[in-house]
Amino acid sequence: MKMKPAERRRARQSAVQAIYQWQITKLSAGQIIEQFSTDQDLSKTDVPYFKELLTGVIHRVDFLDEKLSPYLSRKIEDVDMVDKAVLRLAMFELTQRTDIPHKVVLNEAIELAKDFATDESYKFVNGVLDKALRSLKLREEEQGK
């Protein structure tokens, strides 16, 4: 069964909240998934994708932070927690889910920043990911993809 875009969006929204929670509590992915399954209405959410995003970000956080760092004007530790959750999620999709068009990842990240972060966060997220995408596209062109 093909997922609807709204179900994917809800998976990303839940994942940003779960990543934020993980960044603060350092609970395991399993514990956070259990909490979300109990406390949140996930009935119209692509739950397998939510789980993939959360576990993927947690297991690859050092790799994702390394990929983001060249495009940040400050250390990753100094980035707002919500912005960091959105950026990590987007970088996970850009590097691990190459079946999802870059434009979709960028647009979704901007919307997530608008939904959850400060008024100016979406501009920061857009700027970081735009620079990262340009670099990613150059590398793909060099590799002949």
UniProtKB/Swiss-Prot annotation:
Q: Which domain of life is it from?
A: Bacteria
Question: What keywords would UniProt list here?
Answer: RNA-binding, Transcription, Transcription antitermination, Transcription regulation
Signal: present as a keyword of the record?
no
Where does it sit, as one GO cellular component term?
Answer: cytosol
What is one process in the GO biological process aspect for this record? transcription antitermination
Task: Please list the GO terms describing molecular function.
Answer: RNA binding
| Keyword Transcription regulation among record annotations | yes
Query: Which Gene3D superfamilies would you find in this protein's record?
Result: NusB-like
- According to the record, the segments passing through the membrane are none
Function of the molecule: Involved in transcription antitermination. Required for transcription of ribosomal RNA (rRNA) genes. Binds specifically to the boxA antiterminator sequence of the ribosomal RNA (rrn) operons.
Q: Which family does it belong to?
A: Belongs to the NusB family.
What the entry lists under PANTHER family is as follows: ANTITERMINATION NUSB DOMAIN-CONTAINING PROTEIN, N UTILIZATION SUBSTANCE PROTEIN B-RELATED
Name of the molecule in the record: Transcription antitermination protein NusB
